[in-house]
């Protein structure tokens, strides 16, 4: 587990309002369309698929905003595809690598939230999942970075600059 500031990113993204029970219909489908659109418009993809959740409470009946996104090298001056473009600011967060089936994501999130409570870190209400490796045939091969947003004030308490001038962050 690590407290870090994810760097600002450009995204090609899809946004929807949804609930937990509806997430399955987006798996694989939207990412594939994002890749197609990026290739069609010659957009340089610079990383794996991101899923971002805003307003997520963990309760089945509560709606939240879901963004499914691909990071891009730059935002094009002209784009007429089927998705949206945005630049996201730096994202202070508690990060953890989850290896294996996504069925176990809930337990990994519980560990992060427990850690945040122990450390007195205030959540920002935003969650991100970075799908480093997706293996539908062998889910134990999945590698997902979980990022739980924290308020900048919480992040600043943990940040320090060592003698060589390179920022370093606490890691557990």
Where in the sequence are the language-model features?
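A solvent-exposed interaction/effector surface
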Residues: 1-172
């Amino acid at each position: 587990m690590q407290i870090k500031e994810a760097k600002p990113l450009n995204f090609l993204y899809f946004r929807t309002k949804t609930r937990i029970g509806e997430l399955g219909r987006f798996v694989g489908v939207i990412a594939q369309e994002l890749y197609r659109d990026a290739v069609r418009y010659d957009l340089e993809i610079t990383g794996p698929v991101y899923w971002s959740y805003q307003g997520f409470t963990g309760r089945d009946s509560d709606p939240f905003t879901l963004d499914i996104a691909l990071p891009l090298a730059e935002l094009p001056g002209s784009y007429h595809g089927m998705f949206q473009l945005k630049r996201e600011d730096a994202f202070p967060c508690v990060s953890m690598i989850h290896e294996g089936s996504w069925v176990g994501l809930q337990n990994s999130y519980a560990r992060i939230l427990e850690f945040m409570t122990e450390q007195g870190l205030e959540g920002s209400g935003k969650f991100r999942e970075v799908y480093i490796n997706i293996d539908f045939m062998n889910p134990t091969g999945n590698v997902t970075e979980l990022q739980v947003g924290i308020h900048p004030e919480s992040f600043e308490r943990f940040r320090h600059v060592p003698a060589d001038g390179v920022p370093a962050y606490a890691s557990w």
